[in-house]
Structure formats: C-alpha cells, structure tokens
C-alpha cells in the first residue's frame, strides 16, 4: 500500500544521470506512472512523448518486483513472460509513439508487478566545461520509473468499507485506488490517493466523516459513501 498526496498529483520520479539537468518540462512524458494490463487482455500500450526541443532515443528496462515500494525486491522476469516492442524508439521534438507490452505468463489468480524504466537518451552528446575543469553533458540522460500491474487472469475485485471505524479493505486479489476528499466541497489538492494491493487496509479519520470517497478500478469510479452528491474527481 502506498499513498499519494493530492488525488490528481502525478509527480514523476526522475533519475537524471547528470548534474546539469534540463528543465523537467522539457523531458519524457509517459502519462500515469502506474498502469494496468486488464485480466481479459494480454496486451497493453504506453504512449511516450518527446517534450524536448531536439530528437531523443527511448529504451526500456523491465524488472519483476514482489510488491511496489521502497523495499521492493527486483528480479529478472521469466523468459518470455513479459515482452515489449519495439526495442527502441527514435522521436523528433514533439513526436509521440507507443511501446507495446505482451503478457505470456501464468493464467492464475495472482497479481504480478513489474518496474518499467523508460530511458531517454540524447541523439548527440553536447558537453560543457564545469567549474572544476571537467566536462558535463548539457543534454542529460533521463530515466523515468513506472509500474505495470498485470491483473490476475482469474480476477476477484472485492472490497469492504466500515464507516464507523473509518476503514477500507482490499479483500480481493487485485489492486484499486482509494480517493479520500474530506468534506463535500474540498478541492482536489486537499484529497489523498491510496493505492491498495490485495490484503491492504487503510484506516483514516476522514473516512468516518462526510466527504467524497471513491474507489477507482479499471478507470471506473465507485462511490463508497452517500454523504455528498455524486461528483467524480479526476483519476490521474
């Protein structure tokens, strides 16, 4: 289980392999940092946008993880379990294209997680001399980490909500997002987003009070309390 402040916040965790980084507004864009492969399909795509002013090359690295988080254990995926195409993309400034992911793993009731790292590489190596006398790149390599969730092929979406105790539990075998907005007139920035994996439980005082509380599953909003008029927020 992990939490994100602000229900519409999609802050990228960027690893810049250079001390002289370009503005983040002029870098790779991949949309939501968590994306899912639905239980009824074996294919999902991810759009990559080159927001730079010059061409870039994009590559992918994939690791299987036991569970997303700071203490996750990364391993090499089983050969043939998760494939992607193409091997790399070359995009001019402003262009976009899709990487496609194909799942050929077990068709059971277990959810699987993968760390997908998108690597943005300049097509030319421009350097600038640093104050110490060395050279640094003026167009850095950028790595953006995302999480691909392969939902169980035998999926069970189940949850429970106890307003008395302020508790939401994931009693199924696949993840969903919980949006908690205190009060009926609170803004998106005042809310919280919780990502619940199977077995996760969230205890929050706000869940005992009136507010706009939703589950988001497969891009669908599910209102879990009737204390406020229905007004679905953004799923980002």
UniProtKB/Swiss-Prot annotation:
Residues 1-27 form the signal peptide. The keyword Signal applies. Keywords: Chaperone, Fimbrium biogenesis, Signal. InterPro entries: Ig-like_fold, PapD-like_sf. The keyword Chaperone applies. Disruption phenotype: Mutants do not express ECP and are defective in biofilm formation. Induction: Negatively regulated by H-NS. Positively regulated by IHF and EcpR. Part of the ecpRABCDE operon, which encodes the E.coli common pilus (ECP). ECP is found in both commensal and pathogenic strains and plays a dual role in early-stage biofilm development and host cell recognition. Belongs to the EcpB/EcpE family. This is Probable fimbrial chaperone EcpE. It comes from Escherichia coli O18:K1:H7 (strain IHE3034 / ExPEC). The gene is ecpE.
